[in-house]
Amino acid sequence: MPPWGWWPLGLLGVAGLDRFLADHQRWGRFRRATLVSIVWLGPSMLWMWDLTPPGYLVAVTAYSAFFGLGAALAPGGRGRPLGLVGAIVLSSALRSAWPFGGVPLSTLALSLAGSPLLPLARLAGPLTLVAAAAVIGVSLSALWDRRWLTVGVGTALIAGACLAAAVAPQGTPVGEIDVALVQGGGEQRTRFTSQGATTVFENHVAATDTIDRSVDMVLWPENVVNVEGEFVEHPWYPELLDLADELDATLIPGVFADLSEDNVNYSLTVSGDGEVLDRYDKVWIVPFGEYVPARWAVEPLAELTGVRDQLPQDARRGDEPAVLETPHGTMGVMISWEVFFAHRARDAVRNGGEILLNPTNGSSYWLTQVQTQQVASSRLRAVETGRWLLQAAPTGFSALIDESGDVLERSAISEQRVIYGTVERRTGWT
């Protein structure tokens, strides 16, 4: 389930799965593991029903079958504990990479972001957490059967991993800056309109006007500057430059430009004297949200079902490193969806990112499942890279997260708020 403090259920769930699969042949293991996964993914992906009921049913069934297939291919008998660990890790890796470049939502790793196992992420990313949960789960199952060798090996592996995480490099601080994360507020579960875009922009200007102290950098959420045509030709462009000048602070706004042939989603660096210094275009765009995979096949089906007008125009993919240069150092940038992918954070750090920024926008989603999982994902990226992470969303959640994955501040849904913090610029690897 999404990380609402229920992380022990992940470990107990693996233990229960191991017992549920015992003494069954491959077809039986496939059916049982698929059923368990449906019970797991069905509730935690419920937000998707509001967008596309058929897509929800297909996604839950398909991703559950991933785990069913892994359980079927794993050996039975004495090799079951090791085989189940491998099946869970490989199935999780497959979900994170395929199809559509991966859809790493409702994952076992996210459910452990609030657990004592979180530091293990600095060893080899989210799959380290998945492997640890699987090892603990099969060890608990073995404890029930008094299979002491399996229990001993599992305990030794977890103890060794925890020791390695404790002594592993965590990056090095090289300075500090004062920041403000702006959340304009407003209703959840909304859809785009031109009037709504104006309201969103005005809400963020109003929230920014409440900043009551000197800060070095102000982070705005993803696409709260939503314009038709090139942004430099829009009246909001000089208004933003003037706003940065008045603040005497670097402003990082999120822009979505609806161009004639495609769209582009990007963040800018606007200096404290009102000059645009840098730009990062989103690279890892959202399937069916910012582009349509296999459009040639999807469009006729959408036409038949009457949802053709809901298909998005394809966004233009960026191809530059995931960083923004600012007067206060190099910022690593992961716009919205990108924060769910460890390789985007690695790209940012590899190119000199000293602080990670996650401007995002979850205002269109039903419930708070996606937003909650995004905070969990941000915690993973912070630990994996040894960097502070700043997450800003127009209607929540916005959050300030340190290099250990601790959430120091988090907004509420729909409120207008500015989160302040003094954050470390950090270098080095984990």
Regions found by a protein language model. Give the residues of each.
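Membrane-embedded alpha-helical bundles of multi-pass enzymes
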Residues: 1-167, 367, 378-381, 393-395, ...
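Soluble catalytic domains of enzymes that build or remodel membrane lipids, polysaccharides, and related
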Residues: 169-429
